[in-house]
Curated annotation (Swiss-Prot):
Residue ranges of the motif 'KMSKS' region: 572-576
Species annotation: Clostridium tetani (strain Massachusetts / E88)
Binding site residues for ATP: K575
Name under which the protein is recorded: Leucine--tRNA ligase
An MF annotation (GO) of this entry: leucine-tRNA ligase activity
Enzyme Commission no: 6.1.1.4
PANTHER family: LEUCINE--TRNA LIGASE, MITOCHONDRIAL, LEUCYL-TRNA SYNTHETASE
Gene name, Swiss-Prot/TrEMBL: leuS
Location of this chain's protein in the cell: Cytoplasm
Domain of life: Bacteria
SUPFAM superfamilies referenced in this protein's UniProt entry, alphabetically: Anticodon-binding domain of a subclass of class I aminoacyl-tRNA synthetases, Nucleotidylyl transferase, ValRS/IleRS/LeuRS editing domain
Sorted UniProt keywords: Aminoacyl-tRNA synthetase, ATP-binding, Cytoplasm, Ligase, Nucleotide-binding, Protein biosynthesis
Record's catalysed reaction(s): tRNA(Leu) + L-leucine + ATP = L-leucyl-tRNA(Leu) + AMP + diphosphate
Amino acid sequence: MGNYGTNIDRKWQNKWEDSNLYHFDTNNLDKKLYVLEMFSYPSGSNLHAGHWFNYGPSDSWARFKRMQGFNVFQPMGFDSFGLPAENYAIKTGVHPKDSTMKNIETMTKQLKSMGAMFHWDNEVITSEPEYYKWTQWMFLQLYKNNLAYRKNAPVNWCPSCNTVLANEQVLDGACERCSSDVIKKDLTQWFFKITDYAEELLEKLDDLDWPENTKSMQKHWIGKSIGAQLTFKIVDSDLSFDIFTTRADTLFGVTYAVLAPENPLVDKITKEDHKAEIEAYKEQAKKQSEIERQSITREKTGVFTGSYAINPINGKKVPVWVGDYVLSTYGTGAVMAVPAHDERDFEFAKKHNLPIEKVIEGGETLPYTEDGIMINSEEFNGLESSKGRSAVVEKLEKENLGVKKINYRLRDWLVSRQRYWGAPIPIVYCDKCGTVAVPEEQLPVKLPYDVEFTPDGKSPLSKCDSFVNTTCPTCGGPAKREVDTLDTFVCSSWYFLRYADNKNSEKAFDPKIINEILPVDKYVGGPEHACMHLLYARFFTKALRDMGYLNFDEPFSSLTHQGLILGPDGLKMSKSKGNTISPDDYIDEFGSDVFRMYLMFGFDYTEGGAWSDEGIKSVSRFVDRVERTLASCRYYINNPSDDKITIDNNEKDLNFVRHNSIKSITEDAEKMQFNTCIARLMEYTNALSKYINEDNKNSKFLKECVEDFIILIAPFAPHFSEEQWELLGMTYSVFNEKWPQFDSKALVKDEIEIAVQVNGKIRDRITIASGLDEESIKETALNSEDVKKYTDGKNIVKIIIIKGRLVNIVVK
C-alpha cells in the first residue's frame, strides 16, 4: 500500500480553499470557459456513483482546460424544488424544507470530498426565497409578454402523484416519476407559449455542438409538418371544422372524417339518436392514455355522430365519426380519412364498412401510402403528388376553404402543479380586477412552512388560509392567491444565468455580466433531459433575448452526455435491487482520486457500464505503482550517481513516450476520451520505471520527464499529483503550471521496427533507420534470411512499402 489516501485528499482540499486557488477572474474574460454540470436533486440523502460519473470526469476536463490557460468558471448548486424532494419528505415524515436543507448539507460535503474546482461562492439553491423570487420574476416577464397564459384544457393527471404532468413527463402512457398510468382530466392550468419559438428551436439545433441523437430527439419532439389547413362544413348547419393534412393530393379520396372525443364540436353535431352511444364512448376514451390511443397495434374504435360534412374539393357528403385515435391536443382535433392511402384510415374503414376510393396511382394493393399520379381527381388527374398538393390548396384558398400551413407536434408547456414543494405562482384573483400579476416589488411570494402537503388531488396551498387570502395589488380589495406551484423545470430553465451573479438582490442577473460570461461553453449531464430541461432552457434563453436581457441565442454551446453506471450485476442501480454503489465507502478505502480515475479508466465516458470492485482495485494498484516509481525517480534526481548529460538511446526512448503521451493525452482529454488518457499514463509509468533501472541516467532529463508526468496526471488525480509535485520540491500548485506541448521532433525515432510480409503474411520484423529511403528499405527486407525462405526461386511481382509500418513483397 502506498501513502496516498483520504488524509492527502483533505490536506490539499484545505490548501486549495485557503489559497482560493480556483478563483474565477471576472476581469479577464478573453479566455473564459464556463463549464457546467447539471445540478443535483437533493431528494435522497446521498450522492451515488452516477453523480460522481457526471461531476468527477467533467471536473478533470475543466482542470485540463485551466492548465491550458483558460479562465474556468465551474459553479455548483441544487435543484431543490419539485416532486422528488416532496415525495422523499412524505416518505420520511420530515418537512420538505428541513429534509432538503439537510440533504444539501450532506451532498455539499460529498461534493467537496471529490476535490472538484466548484466555485461554491456562486452556489444557487432553487428552493431558497433569494432564488425563487427571480423564478417568479421570470414568470411575470413571460406573462407581460403574452408568453404565459391560463386556460381550461384536458391535461395529463397522475393519480398516484396527484398532480398534473407536462407531455414530456409522460413516458409510454405512464408517469415518469412513479410509473402509474396517466389519465386525462379537464383543469384550468397555466401554460408557457413555447410554441411561439417552435421554428427557431428547430432551426438553431444544427448550429449546436450537441450529440446528434439529442438533436434528433428535439427535432422529433418539435415535429414540424408542412401542409395545409382545410375547412369541412357541416351539412345543414353553419358549423364547420378544420383539419390539417400533409396530403392534400388525396383529398378526393376522403370518405369520412373523424373528430377527437374531446372536440367541443362533437356535442353540437351529434344527432339525438346517437347521443347515448357517443357519451358512453367519450367516457371510455377518458380512461385511455394518449399513447394507448395512438398505438398502431391497437384496434381502431369509433362511433358515428349521425352528421355529415362537405368535402371542400368536390362537394361530396362524408360521414363524421368520433374516434379516440384522434387527439384534441394535436393539430385541430379532427382528421380527414383517406382509407385508400393511409394505413390507419384503411383499418378503420374496413372495420366499419366505409367506402375506400383510390385517388393516387401506384402499388398493387391498398393502402398505397407513397406519392404518385393523381387519378379520380377531376381536373387534377395526371398531376404528380407534389404538384397536385399545391394545385389543390391554391384552388381552396380562392374559395376560402383552405390555406397553406405549417404544423408542429410541440405543445405549449404546462407549468402549474397541484403540489406544495415548488415556487408559488405570482398571481392573485380579484372579483373586481380579475387576474392580477403580483407587482415585482412584492416578490417573492413566499411559500408558507406550515402546510399540510400530503397529496389528495387538491393544491396543498389551497388549505392554507393565511396564504390564500390576500389584498388585490390593483384596487386594494380582498383577493385570493393562485394556489398551484410552478413545475420544477421552470427553476432549472434559467439557473445557469443566475450562477455568475448569484448575490444580486436587485435583479435576476445583471445583463452586462451575464452577456460576457454566457453562454455555457461545456454542459454535461444525462440524455434523459433531451425533450424537457434542454428544450425549456433554450426557450427561456430565446424569450429573454427577445425581451432585451440577453445577447446570445443558445444557452449551451457544447453538450456532452455521460453514460450510465450500472450495478455490479449489470442492472440499473436501485436500493430495492441492493446493487447501489456508495462512493463514500470506496473513497474511505482508496481515496477520491482512485475512485475518480476508475470512473475514467473503467468506462467509456459517454457509454458507462457495470461497476466492478476488481476494476477499482486495479486502479488502486496502478496509483501505488506510480507512487513507487516517482519515489525511485526522486531518489535518483536528488542523489545522482554516474550521472550523464548526454541524450542517448535510452533517453530518446523515454523522450518518445513522454511526448507521445503529451500529444495523445492532449487530444483525447479534449474529446473526453478519458480511458485512453489513463492508458497513456500507464505506458508513461512503464517507461519511467524502465529508465530508472538503466545503469547510466541523466538526472536533469529525468526530472523534466517526471515534471511532465505529474502535470499530465494532475487533472485525473488532483490530490495525488499535488502531493507528488510538492515531494519533487515545488513550492506552488501543479495547477498553476502550463499544460506541456509535445515536440514533434521527439516523435521521430532514429530507428524503427517494421513488419515484412510475403504475400500478405508476416515473415520477419526488421529494424531500420527512420529516414531510410525506399530502395534501401527494399534491399534490407529482401536480404532478411527469414524472408529469403519464401522468395528464393520465385518471381517478385512488386514490393509495397507503407512508410514506418510494413513492407509487403508479392511473389509468384
